[in-house]
A protein has these predicted regions:
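Catalytic Walker B motif of ABC-type/P-loop ATPase nucleotide-binding domains
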Residues: 162-165, 469-472
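ABC ATPase C-loop
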Residues: 155, 461-462
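Conserved beta-strand-loop-alpha-helix hinge in the C-terminal portion
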Residues: 216-239, 524-550
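Conserved ABC ATPase signature
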Residues: 137-141, 444-448
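Conserved ABC ATPase "signature" region
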Residues: 115-133, 398-412, 416, 420-440
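H-loop/switch region of ABC-family ATPase nucleotide-binding domains
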Residues: 196-197, 504-505
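ABC-family nucleotide-binding domains
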Residues: 172, 479
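The feature captures the beta-strand-to-loop junction immediately N-terminal to the Walker
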Residues: 45-47, 318-320
Length: 551
């Protein structure tokens, strides 16, 4: 009896896709063809901005049904039943409270009211979102908790196809394990397409890896083991994450300052301690906290009994989602009410206004969500805005007989001249080049990929040259190349006497690069420990040639 060949069913089939965003100079995809079989588990890999998220939106039917983008395709067959988890979870919430968000999904499925609560509670347990009361405002959740909620909403749909755009980017290690365990538990007979830079949790169970290069063209397509073995050099060349990327990139520097790290930012004014002695015991702290607490809604959100930040420090702030890490940084910047002692060098501000002014003078801050700090309609203007604001502040200080903010690189002549404006624009363009954003100078910040938005937000903060840089998850959504380049920039700042306070869930950063690790749990700094690195140690992370600059 002859064997009957079983026909493989197609979940999605895209042939000859050509797509171009308004205002972009080039096509994103040029005749891209991808077929995904029903039940396949597919991982999309590629540099930041190569079109992975855009392809997911095409597969989900949002482009062109919801978002009008000029595109053509010889064939466009996409799944009918889709659950989508966006890169930014806040973009998909429709209701103000957690239980209402999940109930809204069930209402659309015509689920009887009496069945909703047990299904909502089960969905929250499935993704590890343990709340004392599900009727809590979504705005009160941390970004990592919002990611769990977004996945719970998608799973409640019980879709045939799950499209996951970095669903674990903002989660702590335990949260990542919980999320991917939940996905695996519902993966049987489902098609799953994943965009994820943190590949360690998924490479063992995906059937297939598709690799793109920066222009959106397909580089490789095959089983994970084969891709990472046969195409390792290409992945390294394109700056894409692969299992050994950290080991290949790590290059300690034994001297306190190397030529690669010296004088990282031209024209900066001297930062306090920039020529400080090498011994940590002789360094003057940039920041000292004593009995310091941050308040949210009148309640204590984070408490620090005692801590200091030294010039040359890179402090990794770690802890589970919702522990109070972001609240701590917001309080330091004066964006949340605070109590206790917060001394900047020798200066101790008194009063709320003095505290905010001192924070603005000594620190720059990068939000977890980069869109929170965009204030202009053009990428170039975002960086120029920071420079111009610093200049205008200094002019006002001069008129009042006060001192200028630290780090201002331009001359001050009582007013901004055309020459100053030219310097500002040239300086801004220099930073865009370094951050890989020069080609997008005229684009609206909201039209960038999430990884590009993150780099723009960091560029806008770093250009101010403040002594202390506060970063809330700066590496999420970044490929390997840009992650290492951003960390190299932090190393350069350290070598110039600056310090970096970085919230991160990346254990490699805490283990390899941090001079200190702060552990925050249940709203309190519970551990402040030194690492093997001192404030005067140097490190450079490389991919490809050691002398290559990636920004």
């Amino acid at each position: 009896m002859p064997l009957v060949e079983q026909k493989e069913e197609t979940a999605a089939d895209i042939q000859g896709l050509r797509l171009k965003f308004p205002g972009a100079a080039d096509l994103l995809f040029r005749d891209l063809s991808v077929k995904i079989l029903r039940g396949e588990k597919v991982l999309l890999l590629g540099p930041s901005g190569c079109g992975k998220s855009t392809l997911l939106q095409v597969l989900g039917g949002m482009i062109p049904r919801v978002t009008e983008v000029p595109m053509k395709a010889a064939r466009l067959e996409v799944p009918e039943s889709v659950g989508f988890v966006f890169q930014d979870p806040e973009t998909q919430f429709c209701m103000p409270h957690v239980d209402e968000e999940l109930a809204f999904v069930l209402e659309n499925l015509a689920v009887p009211v009496q069945e909703m609560r047990p299904r909502i509670e089960a969905a929250l347990r499935q993704v590890g979102l343990n709340l004392p009361d599900a009727h809590i405002p979504i705005g009160n959740l941390s970004q990592g908790m919002k990611q769990r909620l977004a996945l719970a909403s998608a799973l409640l749909l019980e879709p045939e196809t799950l499209l996951l755009d970095e669903p674990s980017a903002l989660l702590d290690p335990e949260g990542r394990r919980t999320i991917w365990e939940a996905v695996r538990n519902v993966s049987d007979r489902r098609t799953i397409v994943i965009v994820e830079h943190r590949i360690e949790e998924v490479i063992d169970w995906v059937d297939r890896v598709i690799v793109f290069q920066a222009d959106g063209s397909l580089v490789a397509d095959g089983p994970a083991e084969s891709i990472f073995r046969r195409h390792r050099n290409q992945l390294r060349e394109y700056g894409i994450w692969y299992p050994e990327a950290w080991s290949d990139a790590y290059a300690p520097i034994t001297e306190s300052k190397s030529p690669a790290l010296a004088d990282p930012i031209e024209d900066q004014a001297d930062c306090p301690n920039s020529s400080a002695p090498r011994l940590e015991s002789e360094l003057q702290p940039l920041l000292r906290l004593e009995q310091f607490s941050v308040l949210r809604g009148g309640k204590e959100a984070c408490r620090v009994d005692s801590a200091i930040v030294l010039p040359g420090d890179l402090i990794a702030v770690t802890g589970p989602n919702g522990a109070g890490k972001s609240s701590l940084l917001l309080g330091l910047m004066g964006l949340l009410p605070r109590r206790g002692l917060c001394r900047y060098g020798e200066y101790l501000p008194e009063g709320r206004r003095a505290e905010r002014e001192a924070a603005a003078k000594h620190m720059a801050f990068v939000f977890q969500n980069p869109e929170f700090q965009f204030v202009t309609n053009r990428v170039l203007d975002e960086v120029s805005f920071t420079l111009r604001s610093e200049a205008e502040h200094n002019l006002q200080q001069e008129r009042r007989g006060g001192s200028a903010r630290i780090g201002w690189p331009f001359v001050r002549r009582g007013r901004l001249t055309a020459e100053d404006e030219g310097k500002i624009e040239r300086r801004a363009l220099e930073f865009l080049h370094r951050f890989g954003l020069a080609d997008y100078a005229e684009r609206h910040p909201y039209l960038l990929s999430l990884g590009q938005k993150r780099r723009l937000s960091v560029a806008s903060a770093v250009v101010s040259a403040k002594p202390l840089l506060l970063l809330d998850e700066p590496t999420f959504g970044q490929d390997a190349r840009n992650t290492f380049a951003m960390l190299n920039l932090c190393e350069e700042l350290r070598a110039s006497g600056h310090a970096v306070l970085m919230i991160t869930h990346e254990t490699e950063i805490a283990q390899r690069l941090a001079t200190r690790v702060w552990r925050v749990e249940n709203g309190k700094l519970v551990d402040d420990r030194s690492t093997a690195r001192s404030c005067t140690d140097g490190t450079r992370l490389v991919m490809g040639d050691a002398d290559e600059t990636f920004f």
